[in-house]
Amino acid sequence: MSTQTGYLLVVEDIPDILNLLEATLKFKGYRVVTARNGEEALDVIHKERPDLIIADILMPKMDGFSLVHRLRINPETRRIPVVFLSATYVAPEDKAFAMSLGATRFIEKPVDLPTFLPIIEKILQQGVPTSVEPLNEYEFYDGYRKRLEIKLSQKNTQIARDERLIDTLSEDEKVAFKKSLEQAIEERKDIQALLDQIRERLENTTPRHKPS
């Protein structure tokens, strides 16, 4: 086993994924601390700044996009590299928005560890990245709103399709399918709740136009 060095913060709300990443990275020799959402992550960062942050996007209290935006508008944390992990935000437009926030890399779930670990090692070897000009508050919330509205529309389409399909399945098939449908409905609730929050913040944010 090749031993690596570095202080990593892993931010993930799903316990199984969080535990897997923590155990794997510790096994490789990294010092690892964990958080379950963006708010916890900011508390950890305030105590000791990590060399690299690995963060999910869709999380309660404070999601990954908001976490990175907060980091980038603070000069003291602006240059901490961040790797996004996501199973929900995987469209090219989602990735483009993530990179516009200042993400270093974007990796789709499920995480392929043999690919993931060399990426982490390479980022740490490259050192502190070039500082990215952060989006202003209005640009951030407006861009995020657009992403969430698309996600909500896609989730509604998926649920409507699955609800029509379930009546055509056998009883055995329905059991597993219902669990998947229930999960999709919960995800829709999370997306809608977050969208409501972003819309409210957007209404209270004044657009800041760049000088012509």
What kind of feature is each model-predicted range?
Residues 66, 89-107, 115-118:
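Alpha4 helix (beta4-alpha4-beta5 surface) of REC/receiver domains from two-component response regulators
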Residues 126-186, 190:
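CheY-like receiver
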Residues 34-43, 64:
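Helix N-cap/capping motif at the beta->alpha junctions
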